[in-house]
Amino acid sequence: MVSSRMASGETILVTGGAGFIGSHTVVQLLKQGFHVSIIDNLYNSVIDAVHRVRLLVGPLLSSNLHFHHGDLRNIHDLDILFSKTKFDAVIHFAGLKGVGESVLNPSNYYDNNLVATINLFQVMSKFNCKKLVISSSATVYGQPDQIPCVEDSNLHAMNPYGRSKLFVEEVARDIQRAEAEWRIILLRYFNPVGAHESGQIGEDPRGLPNNLMPYIQQVAVARLPELNIYGHDYPTKDGTAIRDYIHVMDLADGHIAALRKLFTTDNIGCTAYNLGTGRGTSVLEMVAAFEKASGKKIPIKMCPRRPGDATAVYASTEKAEKELGWKAKYGVEEMCRDQWKWASNNPWGYQGKH
């Protein structure tokens, strides 16, 4: 488990900290005694999430949180931020996430995910801040050679989103090889779901959700008429695809474990870790678990497979357990319970129905 030892007041920059995973991680950072600055362009998030974080942690810890509206693609925004504050490390969440959208608009994904990260590296290097946790993705494995996915598997992303994450990883590896003082951890998430147990913060995508759980939740609160399930003829027990769903609070704790590793390990280099549960759950199993948690029936519509979707993807978690001292503690039941608490408290997200 993640150490409960308080931090000694290190100052952390969290890019994309108003987003889904970022906001939950900021809560945990503040509770662990870190000082936090967020930079976010609010393209796919809202400032209300930051306000809710402040309410959750209370006025004392909230005084250690600062928000900056800025865009990593504008290197000047980063320059100003780093010239005003000395950061001990950076957690980099900022970016776009959506497989289908990336196929339709690849240049936007490479701009937001790759160019922005290169800008971040340049400014961090200029100000001699060389400890970095990067948000990567299980999509770098593509159709995996083996299940569960292990960190040293061959990487062959199958779409522009996955490739943008893979290229970020390659840039990180190259920079660390060139400048040995960098300490970089790449966290490959599987499928983040759930919400803070308070029901005050959660995932609030703009437009039609790209991912299963926010889609299910919007059907449950009658924002959408039915759930489209893409592919019901996979070679699995119920014909639907299998994924490794992980509670966002487990993910948040994984980032703190990674941060502590950066502060305590000199020769970490650039190392990748899977953050998942190690257990595969089918789409229909997830629907059934959400129906049980919410008491709502989810109407479904079976649709053809989407090109590039893998049959089954789940994580080997041994490396993170051994080297980070981190292990997911929440199961599917808790994921659905907390997702429903968020959805039922906020059926139209942070800003209500417009």
From Swiss-Prot:
Location of the active site: 161
Record keyword Nucleotide-binding present: no
Record keywords: Carbohydrate metabolism, Galactose metabolism, Isomerase, NAD
Binding residues annotated for NAD(+), in chain numbering: 11-42
InterPro entries the record matches: NAD(P)-bd_dom, NAD(P)-bd_dom_sf, UDP_G4E
Enzyme Commission number: 5.1.3.2
SUPFAM superfamilies: NAD(P)-binding Rossmann-fold domains
Reaction(s) the record says it catalyses: UDP-alpha-D-glucose = UDP-alpha-D-galactose
Pfam families on file: GDP_Man_Dehyd
EC primary class: isomerase
Residue sites binding substrate per the record: 137
GO annotation (BP), single: galactose metabolic process
Pathway note: Carbohydrate metabolism; galactose metabolism
Name of this chain's protein: UDP-glucose 4-epimerase GEPI42
Protein's organism: Cyamopsis tetragonoloba
Source taxonomy: Eukaryota, Viridiplantae, Streptophyta, Embryophyta, Tracheophyta
